[in-house]
């Protein structure tokens, strides 16, 4: 197999402006109990090098565990971790930036191989759904 075939991957990008300050978004991204309310149950700690897991709904031939490791923590700016499950080895990067009326949150999940079209489609749907849950959490004042 050629080297280029091994490294050709796709990146999913989801962006949304939230009518909330970056501090509120950052808490929702980095506090385990808040993260569980809009994303998945977890044992996350915002410490570079920390391994953690998300627990999703188990399915036939999958226990629902997403294995992760924190890569980057830049408070109020960037958060990144690996996201490994079902043969997908990817990296999730959240970037916060000032925006008119609030804070823009950009999520990039990189590492989808050409043969992982179904995983890419599932992630695209899933992250939109997760962002909707994040909006509800923030609007409810929990973060």
Map each language-model feature to its residues.
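Hydrophobic-ligand binding "helix-grip"
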Residues: 40-44, 51-53, 58-104, 110-112
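Hydrophobic ligand-binding cavity/cleft-lining segments
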Residues: 1-42
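A short small-residue
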Residues: 9-11, 107-114
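Generic structural signal for secondary-structure transition and capping sites
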Residues: 23, 34, 75-78, 132, ...
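A conserved amphipathic terminal alpha-helix motif
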Residues: 110-143
């Amino acid at each position: 197999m050629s080297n280029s075939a091994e490294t050709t991957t796709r990146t999913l990008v989801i962006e949304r402006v939230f009518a909330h300050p970056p501090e509120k978004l950052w808490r929702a991204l980095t506090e385990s109990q808040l993260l569980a309310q809009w994303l998945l149950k977890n044992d996350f700690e915002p410490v570079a090098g920390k391994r953690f897991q998300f627990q999703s709904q188990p399915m036939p031939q999958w226990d629902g565990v997403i294995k992760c490791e924190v890569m980057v923590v830049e408070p109020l700016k960037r958060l990144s971790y690996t996201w490994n499950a079902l043969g997908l080895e990817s990296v999730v990067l959240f970037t916060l930036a000032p925006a008119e009326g609030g804070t823009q949150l950009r999520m990039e999940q990189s590492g989808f191989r050409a043969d992982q079209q179904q995983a890419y489609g599932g992630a695209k749907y899933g992250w939109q759904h997760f962002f909707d849950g994040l909006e509800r959490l923030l609007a409810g004042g929990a973060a």
